[in-house]
Amino acid sequence: MSAKDILFDASARAKLKVGVDKLADAVKVTLGPAGRNVLIDKKFGAPTSTKDGVTVAKEIELEDSFENMGAQMVREVSSKTSDVAGDGTTTATVLAQAIYREGLKNVAAGARPIDLKRGIDKAVKEVIGELRTISNDISGKIEIAQVGTISANNDPEIGQLIADAMEKVGKDGVITVEEAKGMDTELKVVEGMQFDRGYLSPYFVTNSEKMDAELEDPYILIHDKKISNMKDLLPILEKTAQSGRPLMIISEDIEGEALATLVVNKLRGTLKVCAVKAPGFGDRRKAMLEDIAILTGGTVISEEKGYKLENATISYLGQAATVTVDKDNTTIVEGKGQADDIKARINEIKNQIDASTSDYDTEKLQERLAKLSGGVAVINIGASTEVEMKEKKARVEDALHATRAAVQEGIVAGGGVALIRAAKGLDNVQPENEDQKTGVEIVRRALEEPLRQIVANTGTTDGAVVVERVKQGEGDFGFNARTEEYEKMTEAGVVDPTKVTRTALENAASVAGILLTTEAAITDIKEEGGDMPAMPPGGMGGMGGMGGMM
């Protein structure tokens, strides 16, 4: 084990504070509509320009190990807030720095760190309760656009795109952000359920221009096993042909005699048919087939459930308004399943998402949820240069996370106003001693810091004056840093998701409390470069005398 370096009490906290301040000072310049960009050097390629707090925080590594520990603790505030709420990372960093700074002053003056932390925790609990009280539910497209605009650093185009996407695919729909090949940023929506499986044979194509198979009002056969024997499939084919409607087959695979017979019947015009492989693998495939069955009102023909393909009847088949299949994807529009069954399935998947501990599983469950809920929207980001594209894509992703958070828990007045109004909740705190009371006052002072920093970034107004003026106001009265005017923030479209504000405060207080109660810091002693063994001299030792051979 390598030797360790240890610092205690005030010495440890002072070093940690230097690290906290270095990271926070780099991050907080990005806060608010007047926030500045940070340029980050990359070992490969062009530097990255960003106004995203968590991106800045993740790039910071300090040379001094003790300072770096402080910086990494605050980086944790930023990344945790980003993971949970998707935005608010800079606000969280500013709050953490303010709570730690004020707390350190009091620890140096003789306050007990543990009681300070307890006071801070009690205060945060009451402030969050007050935030929930003043929060308003979000419903309209305009409000969603406002949240997206603010989170995208006041870019109304991005706010409107996200509002359009949410309107088309619903609040549970999947919205993905991709890089466009051109310079235009645009929204593309795929309605219905789409999965990444194309036709098994190009002979199934009905539209030779688009090279896709379009089935109107088809029956849908869903089978979880491979189909290779024609006699198993024949009974249901005959019943479908008699009805005169097209047939869509989704199964593990179709091969040999069965596939050849389907192609021949399609070419002869006996039966309008198309076949695709089932999406996914293993247990996820079973779940997705069940989703398709519920969406279309059909039954998965599975021997595990006691159903056999040769005994299948029309009642086993699902139905939809249209099914479109190209070489890569299958899209089912307006499945004719029972609304109550679909709703129950959606709730079941939501419960699985809540219980999931894996990011990958959660992502796949959310995709399934979206496909049942109404569709997938893709925002294609266009820009002139790669640097601009990456910066814009990061802003769109932030804005998307923020709007989802707003839909979940509502919105509060933005621009740091909500935190100042929520300070009213501190009157309900019952501290057990003077040090806990001091902890409450630390939070009261810290709640003003985001507004103070937003104003500082404008570079034109005194933050202390603005904070006092806002504190004298009521409701959503605040300072709009973009126009540099005092006005009602909600009417001006300056709003924040409640979840973002809440998460930022919770995480900031948690990490600041840990830092305040730290009494020792331990790190590896860095080995000096001079301790490395000397390299042997150049050439091949012992062969110097060979020079006389020339």
UniProtKB/Swiss-Prot annotation:
Catalytic activities: ATP + H2O + a folded polypeptide = ADP + phosphate + an unfolded polypeptide
Keywords: ATP-binding, Chaperone, Cytoplasm, Isomerase, Nucleotide-binding
Primary enzyme class: isomerase
Annotated GO biological process: protein refolding
A Pfam family the protein falls into: Cpn60_TCP1
GO molecular function, one term: ATP binding
Subunit: Forms a cylinder of 14 subunits composed of two heptameric rings stacked back-to-back. Interacts with the co-chaperonin GroES.
Family indicated by similarity: Belongs to the chaperonin (HSP60) family.
Gene3D superfamilies: GroEL, GroEL-like equatorial domain, TCP-1-like chaperonin intermediate domain
Protein name: Chaperonin GroEL
Superkingdom of origin: Bacteria
Positions of ATP binding: 30-33, 51, 87-91, 415, 496
EC number: 5.6.1.7
